[in-house]
Amino acid sequence: MNILIANDDGVFAPGIQALADALKPLGRVVVVAPESERSGFSSALTLDRPLRPIQIAEDVWAVNGTPADCVYLSMNGLFDFEFDLVVSGINRGANLGDDVLYSGTVGAAFEGRLMKQPAIAVSLAGPDVRSYDHKDDYAQAAKWVHDFITKGLPALPPRHIFNINIPDVPQLKGTQITYQGRRAQSKPITSHVDPRGRQVYWIGLAGEAVTDPQRIASQIQSDFFAVANGFVSVTPIQMDATNYAVLEDLQASLG
């Protein structure tokens, strides 16, 4: 099996290194990732300048582009073989609820799925994760991904991926299939004056989770709920954002 690994934290991030080490027993693992952090780039592609892939080690490449660029290049001519699976991560921080709209980790996985291959996005969720700088900090999460793939990925419809969030806890309680939760409105921007007297702003402080159960038949909980209670969250998400439930009503009202 040929496995492509990408991320949005950059090619030298400890999460992607741990993931590559864990998956090597499953086949050939190729890492193609941004040369520096590209968090929040979603599925963006670079169209205004050339991309420059540089091989920095055996089966490890750095690209001066976005996470989706890395996957697009890898599956459209950078290599003379095809990949069987795309894994994006392990992200340094959660991608829960509305986070998936912005996530470069998720964007890279979606790009792989657009190329007709199974794809999963993996994130490590916890308050201390941003300070982790060694691949051993991601070892438990990486092993979970290895075991998940080894068991055989459940089949998903076209244009769907798995968004997986693994809580940063000493002992995982198990795995839950979840729906995508949502956050409250993002926290306000913060502003200050820089040393040159210019007003500058910071954005990106995520809002808290909203308790908003979806109307589904079973007792499936949100991704937020699973992670908060020590479970790995596995959420099937799709590219098609059409609201089919209101299509006919909307057509009737505008027709």
UniProtKB/Swiss-Prot annotation:
Where does the record place it?
Answer: Cytoplasm
Report the catalytic activity: a ribonucleoside 5'-phosphate + H2O = a ribonucleoside + phosphate
The primary location reported for this protein is cytoplasm
Q: What does the record say about how the cofactor binds?
A: Binds 1 divalent metal cation per subunit.
Which GO-annotated molecular functions does the record name? Answer: 3'-nucleotidase activity; 5'-nucleotidase activity; exopolyphosphatase activity; metal ion binding; nucleotide binding
Q: Which branch of life, at top level?
A: Bacteria
Top EC class, one word: hydrolase
Specify which residues bind a divalent metal cation according to the UniProt entry for this protein: 8-9, 39, 91
EC numbers on record: 3.1.3.5
Output this protein's name: 5'-nucleotidase SurE
Q: Which organism is it from?
A: Acinetobacter baumannii (strain SDF)
